[in-house]
Amino acid sequence: VLAGELTHRDSMGHTGVLRPGDVQRMSAGRGVLHSEYNHNASEPVRMLQIWLLPESRGIPPGYAQRHFSEAGRRSRLQPLVNAEGRDGALDIHADVALHATLMDAGDAQLRQVLAPGRKGYVHLIDGALTVNGHRIEAGDAVKIDGEHEVVLEQGRAAHALLFDLGTHPLTER
């Protein structure tokens, strides 16, 4: 959630309110019913909903929610979600690591090494940023393929997500 508040309810019994800085990880697995609702008619919700395919089928449904402070991503890559739930991130059933950053003018470069065969993807939520030499503005994204790292620099009030994507997507059958 980027702005506003969103109330969550699901068929597994989870309820809660998501606020700015909160990240929710929901695994549909074998099935779950859920709803998200903004109860405040005067304050819109600004959020991102990101769907990732799991590494395998038939996993049980799951839910987790965590708050990530703005200070934790200022001028650094803050882990939000990864397969092992390491470094304070939420765990996920996919070979993906998702990081967030807030960068501004004068910040040092941020680098994410990509293991052989992995891809990077950067989504710029707000501001402006240079990614591997390509200047992007709010709402833009860059796919990084065939390179060994992702380099973020020259941020201007930049709020970005960086995805480190694995090599084994779920094959549709």
Predicted segments, located by residue:
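Jelly-roll (double-stranded beta-helix
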Residues: V1-R173
